[in-house]
Amino acid sequence: MLPGERPNYQPPMLETVKRLLGIGKKSTGIKLVISCEKLEKRVALLENNRLEEYTIERETDRNIVGSIFKGKVRNIEPGIKAMFVDIGFEKNAFLQFWDAIPAALDSGIETINRGNGNAKKKAPRITHKDVPNIYPVGSDVLVQVKKGPISNKGPRITTDISLPGRYLVLMPFNDQFGISRKIEDPKERERLRKILRELEVPEGMGVIMRTVGAGQRSRYFVRDLSILLEQWAQVQKGLEEKPAPACLFEEPDLIERSVRDFLTDEVDAVIIDDAKAAERMQNLVGQISKRAKKSIQHYTGVQPIFECFGVKAQIDAAFHRQVWLPCGGYIVIDETEAMIAVDVNTGRNKGAKDMEKTILQTNLEAAEEIARQLRLRNIGGLIVADFIDMKNRKDQQAVYTRIKERLKRDKARTHVLPISQLGLMEMTRQRANESLASAVFIPCPHCSGKGVIKSPMTMSVELQRALHSVMRKHQEIVHEVRVTVHPDLLNRLRTDDEEHLIDIERRYAGRLVFRADPTFHQEKFVISDAKTGEELKA
C-alpha cells in the first residue's frame, strides 16, 4: 500500500474499466422471471425473491403507449383547450393544447450544451392560442400515445415525439441534450457529457442519456443512436406514404420492452420459460451488449416457472385489499375512480411500551410497502395515505424521507408532499396504463362493482313490503302465493321474521309458499301465483 493510500482504494480509471468489463460485479439479488403462454406473457421483477414489479400483456390487448400515429383532427374544443384526433381507434384520442406545444426537458433531466458552437436562431415561441391555427379541423398531425385508454376514456396523445432505446432517448423535434439526474456520480456524469457531445446527432434533434447508460462504453451509445435514427426514418417514410389514420411505429411487445426497460447491469439473471422467446431476447441484447446476453437463461423445469420462483403466491396477494407489514401492522388500499386511498393501522403491533416508537415503526414500514404496492399494482393518479398520527415532526419527516427514497426505484414519475397536520400524505404517480386490477378484473355482476350487496335483513324488509302491496292488490283472485328467493334470505325469513309472515297471511287471508333457488342473486326475489305460475306485480 502506498503512503497515504486508503485501504481497498481503487483509482477512478481502474474502477471504470472494471465496471465496463463486469469484473468483480457483486450479486444484486435482482432477476427477471418471464412466462410466455399463447394468450398471455408475464414479466416479474424480483429483488431478493420479493416481487417488486409485475407486467402482463395479452395477444388481444397490446400496449399502445409509445406508439406513433398519423392522425386526423376531428374537432377542437377551445373551452377545455383540447382537440380530438382520429388515430384509428373506436374512441378519438385526446390532445390537450399544451401537449401540442414543444416541451422543455423533464426536471429529472440535466440539460447539456451541445457544444457545436453554432448559435442557432431561436424559433418563434408557440402558445396554446396558436394550436387551433397550426392544427385546424381536418388536418393531419403526427402524435404519440402518452397514456393508454383507461376506463371509458380514449388514449391521450402528444406531438412531443420521443423514441426510447436501450441507452438513449431520441427526440426528433427537440434539439436539447440531457442526462438523467439519477446518475449521481459527478465523474461519471462528466464522462457521459463528453460522449454525448461527440455523438453525431442530426441538426434539430436531441437525445437523452438514460440511467442505464451509466458505466457504458461510447460505442454502445453510437450503436443505439444508429438504431433509433433508422426507426425514425421508417416513421418519416410512413408519414409520407400512408393516409391518416395510420400507425407509423408500434411500441415493441413485452419481450422487447423487457430488454429495453428492465435489463440493466443490476439484473443478475433473466429466466424465461420459452426457448424461442429466450433466443429472440438473446439476439436483441446481443445487438447492444454481448456480455449482457449471457445473463439470459432458458428455464426447462417441470414446475411452472412462476411457481418455481415463488411468484404466483405473491401475485395473488397483490390483489388483496389488506397488506400485512412485518411488524404486525397493515395497510388497506382502496382504488376508486377519483383517487387511491391508503389507510395505515397498527393491527397486531400494540404490545410495545413506547407507543411513539410503535407508531413510527409501523409508519416507516407502511411507507416502504405503499411505495412497493403502487409500483406492483401499477396504480397512479392521486394517492392519499392516512398514516397513524405522529406528534413528533422529526418522525413525520423520517416517514416522508423513507417513502421518497423507496420511490426512487419506480420508473413512473412521482411527486410527494410532506405529511399534513391531519396525518395525510398526498402524492401523485404517473399513470400511463390501467392498473393491474383493472387489467385482470371486470366489475362484479352481483354488486355492479360496488363491492357490497344488501344484507338479508334489508332484503327481508323489502320483500315484506312487496308482499303487502301484491297481496292487497290480488287478494280477491289469488289465494296462494309462491315466493322464490335466495337460500340466505329464506333462512332469515324462516327464523327471525316468521311471525311477520304469519301476520301477512292472516291480514290478507292468503297462503305463502316459499322456495329457495341457489342460482338467484341475493337481492332478487320473485312473487308469483302458485297455481298458474304467473308473476305478480304490485
Feature locations, PLM:
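Conserved catalytic network of the ASCE P-loop NTPase/AAA+ motor domain
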Residues: 25-26, 61-64, 75-78, 133-136, ...
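P-loop NTP-binding catalytic core
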Residues: 45, 56, 95-115, 121, ...
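Phosphate-interacting basic helix/loop segments used at nucleotide- and nucleic-acid interfaces
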Residues: 56, 60-80, 122-149, 189-195, ...
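Charged, low-complexity terminal tails
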Residues: 1-157, 533, 538
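Loop/turn-to-beta-strand initiation segments
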Residues: 137-140, 243-244, 295, 339, ...
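Active-site phosphate-binding and catalytic loops of NTP-dependent enzymes
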Residues: 20, 29-32, 53-64, 126-133, ...
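Conserved glycine-centered short motifs in functionally critical loops
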Residues: 81-83, 87, 91-93, 148-171, ...
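Charged, low-complexity intrinsically disordered tails
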Residues: 1-9, 177-312, 319, 433-538
